[in-house]
Each structure stands twice: as C-alpha cells, then as structure tokens.
Amino acid sequence: MSYVKDIICWKSGASVTDGTPAICEPGDFPEVHYDLSRLAKEFDRDKLSHGPSSLWRYLPLLPVDDPDNAATLGEGWTPIVQTPALGKALGSPQLVIKDEGRNPSGTFKDRGACVAATRLRELGIKTIVHNSSGNAGGAWGMYAKRAGLNCVNLLPNDVLPASLCQSVYSGADTILLDGEWKHSGPMVAEAVQKMGWFNVGTFKEPHRLEGKKTMGLEIAEQLGWTLPDVIVYPTGGGLGAVAIYKAFRELMTLGWLPKGPLPKLIVTQYAGCAPVVKAFEAGVDHADLWEDLDVPPGGLKSTRPPGDQALLKIIKETNGAAISVTTEDAIAATTQAIDLEGLFPCPEVGTSIEGLRKALAQGMVTSDEKALIMSTGSGLKSVPVFPTPKFRTVEAGGSLSP
C-alpha cells in the first residue's frame, strides 16, 4: 500500500502524471507528496526497527505500491562513522561521516536508481535513458538489470573504469560522449523525443529523489531521532542534498522529529565547476551555466545544476554556505581522511572535508557544532584520480626491515 497523494512541480504546483515526462519548467522539478496525516495514524516510527537493514525499512515513505516489486541489491542503511582524529585535525571534534561507499555500486546513486527502477517497472516503463558523469551510470546499469529495464547510458569519455565496467557488464547500452559535457543533456532530450525512452536524469522524474531521501531518514534514525547541527555535502546536480532536507521536513510533519531549525547546509564543489558557489557568492537565487569545466574524472560535473534554486533556497533558510575547493586540496583532504581514520572516500568527498575546514576558519561553522559529512562514494571508484602511492619494494627472500 502506498501513501502517495500526488506528484506536483516543486515551484509551480502543476500536477504531474506518474510515469509520464515531467512538465515542470527549468529550475522546477516533480516532487512526490504523501498523505502524512494518514501515515502518522497508521504507522509508528518504532516499527522501523523491525524492518530490513536497507532503505526498504522506509517503505511507507516511498512511492512503491508493492514491496515484492523491489529491485534491490541490499542498498542503504549505511553507517555513520565516528571520526575523532579527522575531527580534531579540522577543528570539529564531534565530526561524523556517513559512508555511502558501502552501497552495492559504491556510491549513494544506488538509492535513487533502486527506488526509481522499482517504481518504473510497476508503471510498465521499458527503456530508460540518462546522462551521467559516471557513478549514476554504473548504478543505473545495475538496477535496470535488476528491474528488467533496458538502459541507455550517455557517459563522458573520461569516465572512470569502475563505472564504465558496471554500466557495460550489466548490459546497458553504454555510449561515451566525445565532446563538451554541457551538450549531454540536450542530446538525451532529443533521444527521448525521437525514441520515446523515459528520461531518468537528475530531477527529470520524481522517484530518484525519493530514493535519495532515505539518506535523511537514516541520519535521523541513526542519531536517535535527532539531527546534526551541520551537514556538509559535495554537490553536483543538487538532488542528494535536496532529498535529505525533504526527508527532514516530512519527519517533522509526522512528529517523528521535533520541529525546529534544520541543520545548516554547507555544499561544496570543485573550483573548476562551481556554479552553485558562484550563485551563492553573488547572492542570487539561481545558477548560470558554468562554461569552463575543469574537474577530475568522476562526479561534480554538473555545469547547470537542475536543483540550483531548491538548493540555494535551503542554504539561505539554514544560514548555510557554498564553498569551492581546488582539485589538489580535495585530493589532499581525501588522503588525510584515509591516513587519520582508515576511511577511503572518493575525491568528491575531499571537497567537503576541505570545505568544512574552510567553513570553520571563516566562522561559518563553529567547533561546538556537530557536523556530518556525507561521504557520497568509495575511493575504490576513483583510484586513477589519486596520485601514485609511494611504497617500498623487496626482492624475494629479502628483509622486510626498514
């Protein structure tokens, strides 16, 4: 049984028919609304502890009719890891990290792909298409296969090997774009019109957001139905961060979280693709096209983030910020996390580690605030981006002594 009430465009309020191309204008997006009053009467949050250790424990807050339809690989319920050594180094002693690298494909993208693929199968969709800088391509290839959907992935020609293999070996029709990435969106839109495929790109349909919303649901439950003071999130299209805050608002409406201020949102981007940061610093409510893309292979390639307006609104409402970080500083921060904590996040997360350092130095965040960094993916997805490690060699039979 689903508690979905309707799907409407976030900004305009226009109604959207499930399973059809969204009619929302640029800067707007389709959003699922639930009958939270009925849900609050019929479902108690204590029942969640009896559910599976996956995102499917939150079925009442997901847009799926039948849990038996779930195209699951065991995604979600990723740990929140205490990081005292890194926190001390940054000046944030209560710092914790939610490790999304534990998901099946190695990133948080599995959440959106899982829930959306499940719902699209229920709706009878046959072929999906989207443009991805890599991680979502791997996730969609895997979950489309799980759901029995045909998948067309448009990826950049510098896509990292792990994501490429996940896409190709799962049977997705994988196409590499030889040219500027800003052309990928229009190319997908043209294919949708010509072929009738269903576009599952960022904010193009409502169900990916609902899957990623489970990150916020987990944060609240894993922290004992409280919230951190600050959330630091590496941001490309903006879907993940927007989804987390949708979760918090729904939990407050249900009475599962006490009503109060939402966590301060700090979004971070590479300096070579920072349209949200540029908009934040200019004090405007939307991001313009970023022309000169200069980032390493992997995520955070969104030159015109479709969630820009929602993201900037959350930043403003929570007294947050948007911070850019050089590629070099991001990679250095990532290797610092490996050295101090034994965690192996992707370089995108390094923008958030270094971004938190900057936020603390500039007084945007204080040392007594509890900060949570969203580690959106595993460093295993991004090995070629890291510098060649230094190590010793020894001949067979030789000594291991220094």
State the predicted function of each range.
Residues 1-402:
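PLP-dependent amino-acid enzyme catalytic core
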